[in-house]
Amino acid sequence: MNKRMIPTLVLALASMCGWAKDIVVSPAPYAIEQALQQAREERRLNGATDVTIRLQAGTYRLYQSVVVRPEDSGTHIIADKGAVVSGGVRITGWKKQGKVYVADVPEFNGRPLEFRQLWVNGVKADRARDVSDFEKMYRIRSVDKKTETLYVPAAAVKKIQNAKHAEMVLHEMWCVANLRIKGVKIKGDSAAVTFHQPESHIHFMHPWPSPMVTTDGHNSAFYLTNAKELLDQPGEWYLDAKAQKVYYIPRNGENMSTADVEVPAVETLVSVEGTPDNPVTGVTFEGVTFSYATWMRPSISGHAPLQAGMYMTEAYKLRPKTVRPNGDHKLDNQGWVGRPAAAVSVNAATNVDFLKCTFEHCASTGVEFHQYTKGGSIKRCTLSDLGGSGILAGSFGPEAHEAHQPYNPSDARIICTGLSIENNLVTDVTNEDWGCVGIGAGFVRDLRIVHNEISEVSYTGISMGWGWNQQACSMANNLVQSNLIHHYAKHMYDTAGIYTLGSQPHTTIEGNVVRDIYSPGYAHDPNHWFYLYTDEGSSCISVKNNWTPTDKYLKNANGPCNVWDNNGPEVADSIKAQAGIVKE
């Protein structure tokens, strides 16, 4: 046996009675899993009640998700500086072909490796696309829902008309859709573009959000990606999945003989997974860096989101509209949604904490507390360079639950309750799925989102609530306080620094600072942005003492008992100064 394949497990007896144990781990295959197993044995055989796994510096490369189970309750995983839990695979052996470098893609777990992201020396490279400046994106000309066809300028698609795996990323009000191109037919100065199933059917059936065709020049913009014909700029790459070759044009200063080129291979790096009756309890992650998680669903099924990155699995328009109770708008659409993957996922767990961790270089969500969770915290963490949302809290409804309906599960334990999200830096997230959010919460109770700084997001800073109706549901007692949100709405409008949906009794939004919104020229409505935005069904929410440069707010189809008080530039400087991360 190769001794280097065995993790170094140094067991230090902290008590003669065996109450506490330290397990020190160095990087090796399955090192973390073996340490967790060792900790279980210390509890089973020696009665240890307090076990710490210490990750020494280095990269812990995974073959699959690390699963933290109920048997691991009470474990503290603490990382030394430089300890990285990685789902990445390194690409080496680059050879120059003109201005392009090419390398073989290794197999992963005995299968061809496909990926949608690539990083060079920790900097995300661009999947080959037709424009480097998004302000120069082409716009669609018309939509034929019956034939599931988009008509676009012929010049936009001339390069990729014979490409087999090209994709269109289509700007649709508050979401972007990833549509795999099936066919391009050019006639004159126009081209008909069709798409693969299942996303084509879903995309052309659902009414909201929809591709825009207007009379004022704000037709939906789009860009094209994933075709070798588009590979022409430094920092761009293309994967030929069939040949298992990857092509890259280096940026200035990059030496491909020494560069660390990483692609993601594991979808969820760590899954904390209990059961409703036997939750994982009292687990802490401290100082751990989680990097290079993948999410391949858009390459398999496309991606047609409803909102906040939640992709539709079925959707269609209602004719006539459904009359709803309690003064809600008539409902003109139906939709069922799935949830994007997260690099770290927590389900059925009590008091799981992430302290001073880093979530970076991932395809989708950074960290989520999904369902059957109680307590727990995400504190003093950094979330950056993520394709999707930074943090997601709570369920957005099971996949069988229609998204516009109130959600009141008979087993209330399913609701994410008592989570604290405090003093985190969330920046450069949503850099791939522009419709995602900095921090997003679905059906939650007793949630605290306080003293975070959120910047460089494509859409909304903090989105809280779900359901588009004012009927009583499982949301209540949430707090959004003293957050600093700036440089948001980088790509999407119908947005706000802080946005709410649904009835949330005893919920407070207070003492936040929202400023510095982007002005993308391709937004569907250049005036439809806000600092604070209570959307459909928002009810029983107190919005007070929030500093914004002006009072540009929207209250759309709200329910009863909302209170707005003292918001705007007149808010006291002392309140304004308290927003954002509190120094230790």
Feature locations, PLM:
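Short glycine/acidic-rich loop motifs that flank beta-strands on beta-rich extracellular proteins
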Residues: 64-65, 267, 294-300, 341, ...
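Hydrophobic h-region of N-terminal signal peptides that target proteins for export
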Residues: 11-19
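The right-handed parallel beta-helix/beta-solenoid scaffold, focusing on the short coil/turn
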Residues: 49-51, 58, 64, 73-75, ...
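Bacterial N-terminal signal peptides that target proteins for export
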Residues: 1-7
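Extracellular beta-rich repeat passengers
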Residues: 126, 130-132, 296, 511, ...
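Extracellular beta-strand solenoid repeats
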Residues: 54, 61, 67, 76-78, ...
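Extracellular polysaccharide-degrading/modifying enzymes targeting complex plant/algal/animal polysaccharides
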Residues: 25-348, 353, 399-410
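Right-handed parallel beta-helix
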Residues: 281-292, 330, 350-364, 373-388, ...
